[in-house]
Amino acid sequence: MGSGASAVEAKEKIAAASDDEIKACIANLSADQRAKLVNAMQLAKSGGGSGGGSSLKKLRIDAVDIAGKRIFMRCDFNVPQDKADPSKITNTQRIDAALPTIIHALQKGCKSVVLCSHLGRPDGNCVEKFSLAPVAKCLEEKLSAAASFTVPVKLLGAGGRFDTKEVEDECASPANGSVFLLENCRFALEEEGKGVDKDGNKVKADKDAIKAFRASIAKLADIFCSDAFGTAHRDHSSMMGDGFPIKCSGFLVAKELEAFGQVLDNPARPLLAILGGAKVSDKIQLIKNLLDKVDMMIVGGGMAFTFLKVINGVNIGGSLFDEEGAKIVQEIMEKAKEKSVEIILPCDFVVSSKFGEDGEIKNADMESGIPDGFMGLDCGPKSIEANAAAVAKAKTIIWNGPMGVFEMASFEAGTKTLMDNVVEATKGKVVSVIGGGDTATACKKYGTEDKVTHCSTGGGASLELLEGKDLPGVKALDEA
């Protein structure tokens, strides 16, 4: 980011200065200068960037002259299909999310839009049930409705791969305003670089074949546009834009990057991270990275029981205990203390004799512990109050992982009430970002997707971004 260099410089200067030098410096500062110093120190704490050193400020499609140009647009049309009839799409949300970028390109007079996506896991084989033919039909209906006239969407490479001379010729000189949808890019082994053969054996794509496949993509258009945040953490061929002179983001990806930039690059403070999920070991990198950035951290969900057993010796009964994750709990707590991060753990619980609502359900607390034969499936009322208090203090919130088994009504209070708290805070101008995955599912369940600042569409991508990793599909794009 633009602040990255200044943050590094500030961090180095702060680290090099002695206590006496810092005190002498502060004593001679004006109020305005003190405010700037505090800001620099906050930048130093946050690392001044999103992670991996890669900027999240990328060239957007609305900053590119696309009139008369052919646009290759990588989308995410990995839509849910009816199990009995795969030709039926059961939820068009991902198609709807791509429409603003497609419509913008057409309105700005582009020559053609060449859409590309994966669907399912065909593992480098042409699998009929994973054909994008139903997506082409749905896209045509939605684009035509938006335009009030028929907008044909032609599927290229139908029944096979799209890296053919026939497809290349079709895209070479299309009629103005043409919309093409390439057949499932994962039908090609060279897309992911690996897959299975007809006998089910694992195979890898030849490096030269991958290079040729990427070159074939670059022949289809003049400008590369990525609008598939959900696969931005994969260095798959159609995500990288190799061979394109201009590589920009679509509106969906731009929105994701802007939202995470607000949280990770010099956020308003206090910054609160809410982390849930089952295993500590699955979130080690996430926790460690966020401890360098946040002021408060709520640890809930199943992994909270591992923390409580290690730190306080609490009897957790049959609750989830992560043996591997337990090994680094003390290290995490020591880092939190070193970084002055307040860790908020549950102090009471809703427990059940079964993993379900048909067991004996009761409350437990730290003093009583969780009886043998019972497992913690949600946090209790006092924990809910403590979580609400943390949200009330925050100016920026990032949330990844539920507080309990919210799919069951008896164990949803921790997650549902916290969601209500976050929504209320958002009304008060707090920046709130939901980091995809199960928390995004909770947003959908409670109808709060539009009531938080941003609800991410990328589970794995958002997690890796929060872990401080570069996303190949983002790093490949041109800087703004």
Language-model segments: which ranges?
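Long, low-complexity, highly charged intrinsically disordered regions that are enriched for acidic
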Residues: 5-51
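Active-site loop-to-helix "anion-binding N-cap" substructures in soluble metabolic enzymes
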Residues: 50-480
